[in-house]
Amino acid sequence: MNVTSLFSFTSPAVKRLLGWKQGDEEEKWAEKAVDALVKKLKKKKGAMEELEKALSCPGQPSNCVTIPRSLDGRLQVSHRKGLPHVIYCRVWRWPDLQSHHELKPLECCEFPFGSKQKEVCINPYHYKRVESPVLPPVLVPRHSEYNPQHSLLAQFRNLGQNEPHMPLNATFPDSFQQPHSHPFAQYPNSSYPNSPGSSSSTYPHSPTSSDPGSPFQMPADTPPPAYLPPEDPMAQDGSQPMDTNMTNMTAPTLPAEINRGDVQAVAYEEPKHWCSIVYYELNNRVGERFHASSTSVLVDGFTDPSNNKNRFCLGLLSNVNRNSTIENTRRHIGKGVHLYYVGGEVYAECLSDSSIFVQSRNCNYHHGFHPTTVCKIPSGCSLKIFNNQEFAQLLAQSVNHGFETEYELTKMCTIRMSFVKGWGAEYHRQDVTSTPCWIEIHLHGPLQWLDKVLTQMGSPHNPISSVS
């Protein structure tokens, strides 16, 4: 018997609860997490019994098992901080769980994490994992019924001319209103259909403020219902490898009335890599393209000799043209940004001590901002930057407005993000290519889906060219 085992003692209660642990990794961490929980639950009469009942009879109704909420909502276990309901759902249900964005409480839960109460329920069977929504196929007419004279290319020219010289700016969460609590409206000359978050018909110089809330208390928004054209209604909720949940999204069976010869159904397919990331310094691309094979990706300023496939380490990349401003900015990237792809939604969580700045047309559409608005995400906050279902709605609506309208959506499939230094109307840098360190994220699923739809639509009436 060695010295470590001589002095280590696991209580019978902890051993009992560890009997229901899922997965075989991180035994010591799980043991410490359960031990910390037992110490809290022993102070509450009946709490231990209720937890054991929930774990032993997962199909049966059970009561909330609560612990006090900490100031920042997180719990520290062995030098690692995490949200309590995520920690214990990982221990007893889903070892590959990465983020609170992947969880939603059941209706029976009285103390869900997002309710901001003094107590937090950690009963793992009071939460469910967010499922990837099934996206309806886009129905492309086989024969265009639109007059070439009515092409929307001229509107795109106008939109480009009307866009401000510099992008507008917004700060999360102060500038963000609740997206579904305002009437629909539309920006003038915008090529996108009505955005759900706009409450003004003019470009906002500074978006409307709202209750900022807490970054630790922001559950994922309930996805909007899937969209099909009005004449064809259809009724429609470590890291995880891409081929487990995401690739199960098969197209639903089409109703008889739209199984007809005059439309071609183009279904969404999940690609092998959900995104690729390219790193830039000013207007120079640096290093190779990073392909995300995991639904959880870290982009940080460190070096990682182990070549972890879930990390894009910018500290490894060299550039002979690097100046002192870039060098100083790189030193402040630190833990960088955590990108999650869960339930058909992409989230960016700022882990750096400095803010990150995001330009996502899908996010801007959702919140009713001008398409080119740059959103500041402070340290410790996370923001949804892309929603597959909203993109599906736009894709299905735009197909009836011609090739050029559909092609415009390619801009929505690329997200730009700068570290430490921002750009736009409130900063002296006007364009992202003027920022020292930035990345461009290409979303492969939406891009490939859009490409297939455009292929079915055929050539535009007025081909887009360098002089169009």
UniProtKB/Swiss-Prot annotation:
Q: Share the record's PTM remark.
A: Phosphorylation of the C-terminal SVS motif by BMP type 1 receptor kinase activates SMAD1 by promoting dissociation from the receptor and trimerization with SMAD4. Phosphorylation by ERK2 MAP kinase in response to EGF or HGF prevents SMAD1 nuclear accumulation and transcriptional activity in response to BMP. Dephosphorylation, probably by PPM1A, induces its export from the nucleus to the cytoplasm. Dephosphorylation is inhibited by association with EGR1.
Q: What is this protein called?
A: Mothers against decapentaplegic homolog 1
State the compartments where it is located.
Cytoplasm; Nucleus
**Region of interest: L3 loop:** 421-431
Pro residues: bias regions = 221-232
The UniProt regions of compositional bias labelled Low complexity, in chain numbering, are: 188-210
**What Pfam families has UniProt attached to this entry?**
MH1, MH2
Q: Which residues carry this modification: N-acetylmethionine?
A: M1
Q: Subunit details for this protein?
A: Found in a complex with SMAD4 and YY1. Interacts with HGS, NANOG and ZCCHC12. Upon C-terminus phosphorylation: forms trimers with another SMAD1 and the co-SMAD SMAD4. Interacts with PEBP2-alpha subunit, CREB-binding protein (CBP), p300, SMURF1, SMURF2, USP15 and HOXC8. Associates with ZNF423 or ZNF521 in response to BMP2 leading to activate transcription of BMP target genes. Interacts with SKOR1. Interacts (via MH2 domain) with LEMD3. Binding to LEMD3 results in at least a partial reduction of receptor-mediated phosphorylation.
What organism is listed for this UniProt entry? Rattus norvegicus (Rat)
Q: Where in this protein does the record put region Disordered?
A: 162-246
Where does the MH1 domain start and stop, copy by copy? 12-136
Q: Which residues form the MH2 domain?
A: 274-468
Organism placement in taxonomy: Eukaryota, Metazoa, Chordata, Craniata, Vertebrata
Gene that produces this protein: Smad1
On this chain, the residues bearing Phosphothreonine are T325
Instruction: Please give the tissue specificity annotation from the record for this chain.
Output: Ubiquitous; present in liver, lung, stomach and spleen with lower level in heart, testes and skeletal muscle.
Record keyword Nucleus present: yes
Return the GO cellular component terms, semicolon-separated.
chromatin; cytoplasm; heteromeric SMAD protein complex; homomeric SMAD protein complex; male germ cell nucleus; nuclear inner membrane; nucleus; protein-containing complex
One Gene Ontology biological process: ossification
